[in-house]
């Protein structure tokens, strides 16, 4: 069966879509990452399963990026790595892991240093999942928004492997998003939108640390 979509990206003439997938039955569970590609977003070709469960757990939600500058060192011979950042779930806890591909997502290698984030002890909570990662050009860093306990946390990294906690915003639940939008179409006046699966959102400013506009109203 097929569940949440994630990791939508465009690379070298193809759109890539990953999704939670149980290849064994129609019930929820045994999560893998399925993979499909398209050149027009209308017609899709289903590819072999991208990510399988391992000793860290089954494969929950996450995101995918192209490491054009080879910050991770995974790229070879001028080919940038496609890197998946995902939650591995097991009965004890949820941890964040990465895997990479050098053949446009057809085969994947999991990072030997997984997990890259294990924050159960920090939050005294098993609920640490759904990493959304993007490249923040002004700072020259990767940024991760991660659902932890009762809100979204922000981490940053130079290499997709080593992550530094920056801040935490309460009031959100699962599947975080953080993106920049122009105000009334004015690209010189932008706001950052932090969003959660419940439909909750905040507007604010972002430069590695996220500050909600609501804070100015308190």
Kindly give the residue locations of the regions a language model identified:
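Catalytic-core region of carbohydrate-active enzymes that cleave or remodel glycosidic bonds
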Residues: 181-184, 192, 201-212
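Beta-rich catalytic cores
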Residues: 4, 31, 60, 127-129, ...
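Conserved small/polar residues in nucleotide/adenosyl-binding loops
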Residues: 2-6, 210-215
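Blade-loop segments of beta-propeller domains
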Residues: 32-35, 41-71
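Hydrophobic core segments of beta-strands in well-ordered, beta-rich domains
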Residues: 4-24, 46-50, 65-66, 73-91, ...
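Acidic-and-aromatic substrate-binding clefts and catalytic sites of carbohydrate-active enzymes
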Residues: 25-27, 53-57, 170-172
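Extended, polar beta-sheet/loop recognition surfaces of beta-rich domains
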Residues: 218
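Blade-edge beta-strand/turn elements of extracellular beta-propeller
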Residues: 41-53, 104-122, 154-170, 203-212
């Amino acid at each position: 069966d097929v569940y949440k979509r994630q990791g939508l990206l465009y690379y070298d003439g193809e759109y890539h879509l990953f999704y939670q997938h149980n290849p064994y039955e129609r019930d929820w569970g045994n999560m893998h990452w399925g993979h499909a590609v398209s050149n027009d977003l209308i017609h899709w070709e289903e590819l072999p399963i991208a990510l399988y469960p391992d000793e860290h757990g089954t494969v929950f939600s996450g995101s995918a990026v192209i490491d054009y500058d080879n910050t991770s060192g995974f790229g070879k011979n001028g080919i940038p790595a496609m890197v998946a950042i995902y939650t591995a779930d097991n009965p004890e806890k949820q941890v964040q892991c990465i895997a990479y591909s050098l053949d446009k997502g057809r085969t994947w290698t999991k990072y030997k240093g997984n997990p890259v984030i294990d924050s159960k002890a920090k939050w005294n909570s098993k609920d640490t999942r759904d990493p959304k990662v993007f490249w923040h050009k002004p700072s020259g860093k990767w940024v991760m928004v991660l659902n932890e306990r009762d809100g979204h946390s922000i981490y940053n990294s130079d290499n997709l492997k080593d992550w530094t906690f920056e801040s935490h915003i309460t009031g959100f639940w699962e599947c975080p998003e953080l993106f920049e939008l122009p105000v009334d179409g004015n690209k010189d006046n932008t706001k950052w939108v932090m969003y959660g699966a419940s439909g909750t959102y905040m507007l604010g400013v972002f430069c590695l640390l996220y500050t909600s506009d609501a804070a100015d109203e308190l």
